[in-house]
Amino acid sequence: MKITVRSSTVVVPAAETPRVRLWNANPDLVVPRFHTPSVYFYRRGGEDGGDACYFDAGRMRRALAEALVPFYPMAGRLAHDEDGRVEIDCNAEGVLFVEADAPDGAVDDFGDFVPTMGLKRLIPTVDFTGGISSYPLLVVQVTHFKCGGVALGIAMQHHVADGFSGLHFINSWSDLCRGVPIAVMPFIDRTLLRARDPPVPTHPHIEYQPAPAMLGSEEPQALAGKPESPPTAVDIFKLSRSDLGRLRAQLPTGEGAPRFSTYAVLGAHVWRCASLARGLAPEQPTKLYCATDGRQRLTPTHPDGYFGNVIFTATPLAEAGKVTGSLADGATTIQDALEKMDDEYCHSALDYLELQPDLSALVRGAHTFRCPNLGLTSWVRLPIHDADFGWGRPVFMGPGGIAYEGLAFVLPSANRDGSLSVAISLQAEHMEKFRKMIFDF
């Protein structure tokens, strides 16, 4: 598919904004230092199908400039303070807005919207060669297809926002674009996530310990260099409401039977299928990384518009033999880990991070999720389909590629039919087996 750039513009805030250095909390600094990619797809049809200004770039840029006034950190740049700690320089240098055409392409060409790295063509490339203060924290691209549909590709620097805050910005931008005021203004003060003084961690925090290595490997996985990686494959699997019901039918019932969240049940199934597809020995330790929003877990709860990263991580750890056993065993392991994530645990995590000499050493990446481990991030409770810029809701929103083997996402359905989709990256030989197992229940 050929994509040509129609225009490329730096959009700055529409009014004067505070020129400050924004301190980053510890959760802002243990996320990967890259731009998180995501892609929205919109089909042209119905009443909006005849709109000559469908996804009008000028209208979108004006709304973007308005949104950058209250969300002013998004228009800034990364910088270092005097101690070398990464902070945000709120200098209003702006964000990149690209308009492009794919004259031979159509929304239907993307099929089930599998998040392969090929989707990155729908997102502007960030040039990192000039150092952390040289590049915008947000880049967006509107790509027009021959069918009349549109893709909105977004890459957002992870130090600036987690999924919840990032969507708060995108959805506020879309509201402004269709003439609706911002519902919840951003709260920009990350000192709410300071560690206690003095910091007193009360838990061991295995989530920040090195990921288990494959038994028999020569050196710990977290300390290894960059070995030659096997080829990977990415796919997406849609489980209907009926499929999820059949999964639950495998669980114990009756008086006294445990009640499991949908995430715990689906997570146990994905963890089991991945472990079996990978051929893990029963005694092989495997860790599941579950991103957890701390907003409703911390006491007092954070303001609704808190803008930043409030992500903590639950990490169920078990031998593969237990994971590949009954669905209930896996779900119990996951749910027990999630239930520990209360106010005290989250504050303990903040304290633990405060005591670490180098937070960059804890940043997760390919070494974290690769075999025998897994990351499973749920977007089910995030408002990922609310970005209506005035021309309708997206028919799909998901990650704009999955960079790491062993990383997976759970996505809700755009039409609210109760289905859930699992997008996952695995070694190619493991994916062949995983495809046969994911619907075998």
From Swiss-Prot:
GO terms for biological process: defense response. It catalyses: 5-hydroxyanthranilate + (E)-4-coumaroyl-CoA = avenanthramide A + CoA; 5-hydroxyanthranilate + (E)-caffeoyl-CoA = avenanthramide C + CoA. It comes from the Eukaryota. The active site is at H158, D388. One of its GO terms (molecular function) is acyltransferase activity, transferring groups other than amino-acyl groups. Keywords: Acyltransferase, Plant defense, Transferase. The keyword Transferase applies. Its EC number is 2.3.1.302. InterPro entries: CAT-like_dom_sf, Plant_Fungal_Acyltransferase. Induction: Induced by the crown rust fungus Puccinia coronata and the phytotoxin victorin. The keyword Transferase applies. Gene3D superfamilies: Chloramphenicol acetyltransferase-like domain. Belongs to the plant acyltransferase family. Involved in the biosynthesis of avenanthramide phytoalexins, which are phenolic alkaloids found mainly in oats. Catalyzes the N-acylation of 5-hydroxyanthranilate with 4-coumaroyl-CoA or caffeoyl-CoA as acyl donors, forming avenanthramide A and avenanthramide C, respectively. Does not accept feruloyl-CoA as a substrate. This is Hydroxycinnamoyl-CoA:5-hydroxyanthranilate N-hydroxycinnamoyltransferase HHT1. It comes from Avena sativa (Oat). The lineage of its organism: Eukaryota, Viridiplantae, Streptophyta, Embryophyta, Tracheophyta.
